[in-house]
Amino acid sequence: MAVYTDVAADELADFLKAYDIGELLSYKGIAEGVENSNYLLHTTAGSFFLTLYEKRVAVDDLPFFLGLMGHLATHGIVCPQPVKARNGEALGCLAGRPAAIIDFLEGVWPRKPNVTHCAAVGAALAKLHLAGRDFPMRRANALSVSSWRPLFEQATPCIDTVQHGLHDFLKAELDHLERHWPQNLPAGVIHADLFPDNVLFLGDRLSGLIDFYFACNDFFAYDVAICLNAWCFEPDHSFNVTKARALLGAYNRERALSEAEQAALPLLARGAALRFLLTRLVDFLNVPAGALVKPKDPLEYVRKLRFQQSVGNIREYGVAASGLVA
């Protein structure tokens, strides 16, 4: 979450008159993440999140995101729910931006994920994939393999200012992934951004999944690969096979990965690493002046990509291919 658009107190108070969520007591911007402007609201009725949608979030995609959260909640997935205004609409306009109020979930995201966290995330991700099977709306992944070259070209003039030789390294990897990307793996609704800061816990109990604004239709195993990169590396950039074993095993107990998915996982993990490397790189090079936002380090994903390039098969994630039992 982040703040790109400032909201005046009187403007916000007028906006909230359309909702039955009490009177505004206080609000503050949240300076985490890089995509939308987010505020935590405290009203006489409780706490809520206000999101103003900008950058990569297209207005036409918002019914998919908001509808998906409602659908998943009815299928047992704990996630935020949009608060509808008195006119029945979940989407409004504030400070010239599309805006929505989302209910507040208890919990904090884990700054130091442990094995128990990883297992909980694996199980929750599989349940999300199963719960989304009958969601009627569709959204293509706008940040899948076909989008990576335009991102690379956007960053090209400045890539080597971030790290010498990075341009040629990324070009070679992009060429490889475009040639070898899978075509026919099991697919459906995926979260596509299930990083630790998008998963809430109360102690070691998972209490909610948040930030569905990259959700789309794509390979289930690609979503798993994103989580391997996001959850299973240590601060010293080493890969923790114990965490990977916990995440993959818990996922597989809820939804079994096919042989084709297992075989493709190392390549998908390379793609997942490149996708986040490129978007971080573009964001790092294009932070608006004065924005209350902390761009994430693209070089973290250079290290993760180099590791994933070294992985030959799923066994190197600490599991056996047959039944995912080490």
UniProtKB/Swiss-Prot annotation:
Question: Which pathway does the record list?
Answer: Amino-acid biosynthesis; L-threonine biosynthesis; L-threonine from L-aspartate: step 4/5
What processes in GO biological process is this protein linked to? threonine biosynthetic process
Work out whether the entry's keyword set contains Cell inner membrane: no
Entry keyword Hydrolase = no
Catalysed reaction(s) here are: L-homoserine + ATP = O-phospho-L-homoserine + ADP + H(+)
Classification via Pfam families = APH
Q: Which organism is it from?
A: Nitrobacter hamburgensis (strain DSM 10229 / NCIMB 13809 / X14)
Keywords, A to Z? Amino-acid biosynthesis, ATP-binding, Kinase, Nucleotide-binding, Threonine biosynthesis, Transferase
Please give the Gene Ontology molecular function terms for this protein. Answer: ATP binding; homoserine kinase activity
Q: What PANTHER family does UniProt report for this protein, alphabetically?
A: AMINOGLYCOSIDE PHOSPHOTRANSFERASE DOMAIN-CONTAINING PROTEIN, AMINOGLYCOSIDE PHOSPHOTRANSFERASE DOMAIN-CONTAINING PROTEIN-RELATED
* Membrane spanning stretches: none
Q: Spell out the protein name for this chain.
A: Homoserine kinase
Task: State which Enzyme Commission number(s) the record gives.
Answer: 2.7.1.39
Q: Which family does it belong to?
A: Belongs to the pseudomonas-type ThrB family.
Tell me which domain of life the UniProt entry assigns to the organism this sequence originates from.
Bacteria
